[in-house]
């Protein structure tokens, strides 16, 4: 199951990155998760999955994510001195549901769903800085994915890499070693 879950994650991510480059996005992360899951089910002859199973995997599971255990206690401390925002390819609804489940309080939430341009497009990052009335050089992008941080850095953001070696289970993350150009590792 771990391999299938990671394949679902990989393909859903691929379906989202750079969305909105040529035309307005036709789906959000929830939609991508569902159509990718249906592809994987078909490719692996897993037709035993019911519509309820598909809904539970594609929708309910990501809307019930539990965040990293060290994060809820540290978020309020960061907010004492900084604007702390969620900037994500996930749907607004996933962010709302997971924030409630994990008792997270953000200063602001930015979903690429509302911007109409998805990461890794430069416009997504630049738009967030503009909405915050900040220069890109005043923004720090914190993530555990080099590809996201590299894109943020390319438009002028400062970057911080957080190691999350268990994020992908036994398989390990696709890019476990931070790019040495990040500002904080």
Stretches found by the model and what they are:
Residues 1-56:
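A metal-dependent, Asp-based hydrolase signature
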Residues 11, 80-81, 112:
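Structured helix-beta-strand junction loops
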Residues 26-34, 47-86, 96, 122:
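Short, acidic loop-to-helix structural element flanking the phosphoryl-transfer center
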Residues 76, 87-185:
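Asp-based, Mg2+/Mn2+-dependent phosphohydrolase catalytic module
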